[in-house]
């Protein structure tokens, strides 16, 4: 896992958005593993790199938690039983399975953050890229998030001002 730190406006979020293909480079190249980011490879890159936005409200938009987490796998044209398994597994991993029928706008910020992580995990990316994952969390929710992130076997790239979180979760920092 790698932590990315820097001042406001230093480009941490922009870097993550480029890594996922939400932003395309105007010069130079971006490659994830041996895949160069182009319009043709953009979908493949997005399957490899899942991004969790700083504000979960920018990511959660469906009527229920279940539908939000299922959105990505459904767009991969997976069989219904595979989608159900992925959603259940991701929600269990973030301790939010009991919230599956709730509307996201009724959740706490910490719960929304966990559901946003589950939504990305359900797609099955190789890399989780997270932008300020502990922003707006109370100390208890922040500690729960750190514990959760430390259970993941995914490669993680975390952009944050929270140096303690970076030290607790990441092996390297740039």
Where do the model's predicted regions map?
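Catalytic Walker B motif of ABC-type/P-loop ATPase nucleotide-binding domains
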Residues: 128-131
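Conserved ABC ATPase "signature" region
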Residues: 81-99
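Conserved ABC transporter NBD signature motif
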Residues: 28-36, 45
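Helix-to-loop junction immediately C-terminal to a conserved catalytic motif
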Residues: 20
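Conserved ABC ATPase signature
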Residues: 103-107, 111
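The feature captures the beta-strand-to-loop junction immediately N-terminal to the Walker
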Residues: 5-7
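H-loop/switch region of ABC-family ATPase nucleotide-binding domains
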Residues: 160-161
């Amino acid at each position: 896992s790698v932590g990315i730190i820097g001042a406001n406006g230093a480009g941490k979020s922009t870097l993550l958005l480029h890594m996922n293909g939400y932003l395309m480079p105007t010069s130079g190249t971006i490659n994830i593993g041996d895949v160069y980011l182009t319009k043709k490879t953009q979908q493949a890159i997005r399957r490899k790199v899942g991004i969790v936005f700083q504000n979960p409200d920018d990511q959660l938009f469906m009527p229920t938690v279940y539908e939000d987490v299922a959105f990505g796998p459904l767009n991969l044209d997976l069989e219904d039983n595979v989608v159900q398994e992925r959603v259940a597994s991701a929600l269990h991993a973030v301790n939010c399975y009991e919230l599956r029928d709730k509307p996201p706008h009724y959740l706490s910020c910490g719960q929304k953050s966990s559901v946003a992580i589950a939504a990305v995990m359900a797609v099955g990316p190789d890399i989780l890229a997270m932008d300020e994952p502990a922003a707006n969390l109370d100390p208890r929710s922040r500690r729960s998030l750190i514990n959760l992130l430390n259970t993941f076997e995914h490669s993680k790239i975390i952009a944050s001002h929270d140096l303690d979180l970076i030290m607790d979760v990441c092996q390297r920092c740039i």
